[in-house]
Amino acid sequence: MSSNKIVLTSSDDESFEVEEAVARKLKVIAHMIDDDCADKAIPLENVTGNILALVIEYCKKHVLDDVDDSDDSTEATSENVNEEAKNELRTWDAEFMKEFDMETVMKLILAVNYLNVQDLLGLTCQTVADHMKDMSPEEVRELFNIENDYTPEEEDAIRKENAWAFEDLK
């Protein structure tokens, strides 16, 4: 792992000093490092300190996992160890996401989309999808602050036309 340190500064002026390998998990930062634009603190105006801390925690865990995978010496044991490590990481990811309410998850989605952390973006989006899969349209509207612009008559017509989609909902 690289010993270079990169300083990331959140929108609320919180600074985080991280290993270059961790910072490279944020593809936006990786491009800045490659372009020699990371010699000073990198301001991240679209990410608050508490959300950036969560992104860094995730990236640290995944960098450690990448390093652990590359340390395997024999190919035969490497496959078993690698599969075990992937399962451990999936479990860690699931536990990591359980800690957050939907508001935090939505903030994470915005941050990791901006920072281009694809694995965490997929994980956060899947968390939202899992959360809303059994929700009624009204609950989804409430979750995303969507105004219902259908008249009651239009809504009834849509529900009748697509009754199959509403069978398993509350």
Swiss-Prot record:
An individual GO BP term: protein ubiquitination
PANTHER family: SKP1
Biological function: Involved in ubiquitination and subsequent proteasomal degradation of target proteins. Together with CUL1, RBX1 and a F-box protein, it forms a SCF E3 ubiquitin ligase complex. The functional specificity of this complex depends on the type of F-box protein. In the SCF complex, it serves as an adapter that links the F-box protein to CUL1.
Species, as recorded: Arabidopsis thaliana (Mouse-ear cress)
GO cellular component: nucleus; SCF ubiquitin ligase complex
One Pfam family from the record: Skp1_POZ
Name this protein carries in UniProt: SKP1-like protein 16
Gene3D superfamilies per UniProt: Potassium Channel Kv1.1, Chain A
Residues spanning the signal sequence: none
UniProt subcellular location: Nucleus
